Amino acid sequence: MKLRAIIQFLLSLATILGLPSMMSASGGGAMTAGMTLGAPDIKSGGPMAFGPEGILFMGDTQGAAVFAIDLNDRVSNTVSKPIDIIGIDKKLAAMLGTTPDGILINDLAVNPISQNIYLSVSRRTGRLGFDPIPIYPVSRLIAADSAPVLIKVTKKGALEEVPLIKVMFSKAMLSNQFKPDAKIESLWGEAQWQLTITHLAYVDGQLFVAGLSNEEFSSTLRRLTFPFKQGGEETTGLEVFHTAHERYETRAPIDTFLPFHIKGKPVVLAAYGCTPLAVFPLDEMKQKKQMRGKTIAELGSGNQPIDMISFKRDGKEYILISNTNRSMMRISAEDIERAEPITTPVKESNQTVGVKYAPIAGAGALQLDKLNDQFVVIINRDLQTGGLNMRTTPMDHF
């Protein structure tokens, strides 16, 4: 407690005197101001995203909170060689003293400064083994009796646990959240708290948090001012036309989203289960507590989108989406910009309408992120062994 108080006093004094903060001297800056030295009380490590200065954001679905963690990982680097780990689930299990069915890789995120790869992992602490639902993203399966672990993948492919004991961090509690004992009402049987946070992204001074709330429009996109501050949360309840379900929906959460621009204006490109793709203009979102998005594609029912990234090739921008029950999909940004709204149901199951996509080989892709302009890092399930592999795939494959 004494050390924490001293650090907070020095940070405050530096601010008053207009001096660089201690964190700036060690490589940090304004984004670390107001953080506390200690051990973040993360109950369940879920989705992750990186912000400026190498700050890691980690969603805590069970605790209904988001943590900002300074990993002190700010040395610029470029990865030019593939980093492949065959059987990464077995190696993680051995490292954490359990078996492969006793862990879940909830998310994968790349620090864009250092290009180090980080994994959000759950280790089961109660009965051994998770109950995987084959067509559902693993992040939905975080159990209440699992311990969060943060893993770093080195440039040489080694796995290192990142101790979250003495780190600089800050915490933002989410409003209108479900409690861990909230009733189960999903078709797939997951508790509502497991959907409190489904995806994160940092956008121009705000952390966007997709998921559910206990509001009338349960599907919610929260926007947290960062550095976190009291009263720094804005929320918008979202409605989207679900072509396969033949209705407008307000309870289905965004599964994955991408900050994007259409004709120079910022939007959120959001993908939902079963699988509508919708656009939400950010300027409109900031002015409304509830809003209806524009559905621009139906990518096929019985499927769950997992991750979405953007990349450029030959001067053109594309979107890459990984899925549970479909191949990976490549969509042209130009087609998204030209897309018309879809307001009528599909005529048959599994039909696709709206924006077209190119199917990309990559069955079993569970986690996906852009490593740099050369590589995409993917964790996929091996269809022969059933195990998990992590591979870095050249960008020109897509």
Describe the predicted segments one by one.
Residues M1-I6:
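N-terminal secretory signal peptides that target proteins for export/translocation
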Residues S26-F398:
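Sequence/structural signature of beta-propeller domains
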Residues Q8-S21:
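Bacterial N-terminal signal peptides
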